Amino acid sequence: MDSTQLARGIVRELLELGISDVVLSPGSRNAPLSVALYEVAKKGFIDLHVRIDERGAAFFALGLAKASDNYVAVVCTSGTAAANYHPAVLEAHHAHNKLLVITADRPARLRGTGANQTTNQVNIYGDVKSHDVAAPIAIAPLLAGGPVHLNVQFDEPLLPTDTNDWLDGLEIEMAADLPELEGELHVSEGTVVIIGHDRGTFEADLIIDALLAADLPVIAEDPLSFPGAIPHAALFLADEKVREKLRPTTAVVIGRTTLSRSINALIASAEKIV
């Protein structure tokens, strides 16, 4: 399969998964993806955000993923471009954000030969799940809530030689529903709820309904992810005297708390952590 067909297959997968935002850092080796993405953007199937600087592009995509709680794809060319995505991918990994990183690569046969802009990009992001792709691949089974890396091998020629309407017969596949909260929330006096960045993959509305019924104080490590939380909690909890006065008997933690030392200190001070 040539590079044009491979790129079109990947982009079609993105559309069928319902991914609506793609951030593109254009380059030479990812030209097949750039052309395919432009074609679907022109038809209104995606919002294509072009960002030349790779580091900024990756963080922009991360922001979109956090705000939408949906997978956002970010696409770059080979070599050092892929390395410039690493800071944002690392943050997405620890916060469990939905980032689909697609890096273009030379064919595997050129690795270790000194070819221009060629390095070992497989597993370049450490513990993030990485898939070396030389043929069409089903992306849906790979998406488990955190960042995923597709390293796609493109051989020359990199530009399309046909004008086929490859978007005919497109079917949009709805994303799987997030888990629901089951049962009632029974709490005692002195209970506080702390919500991490990913909300434990639960929908915000489900958490809000449960907490309103229980009438509990709520602290969110990322205030943007939960508007009903106590504002500026991380700031006033930095005062040890305030933290001691507010020490909970039970801390109910939903999701992962990774950034705020003061909030983690409050959790650690609780008599019981759930």
Language model segments and positions:
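Conserved thiamine diphosphate
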Residues: 70, 105-109, 113-147
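Short beta-strand segments
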Residues: 75-77, 98-105, 149-153, 194-196, ...
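Short internal beta-strands
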Residues: 23-26, 101-104, 217-222, 273-274
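Conformationally flexible catalytic loops at phosphate/diphosphate-handling active centers
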Residues: 45, 140-188
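Glycine-rich beta-alpha junction loops
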Residues: 28, 106, 152-158, 197-199, ...
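Glycine-rich phosphate/diphosphate-binding loops that line cofactor/substrate pockets in enzymes
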Residues: 8-19, 64-69, 139-144, 182-191, ...
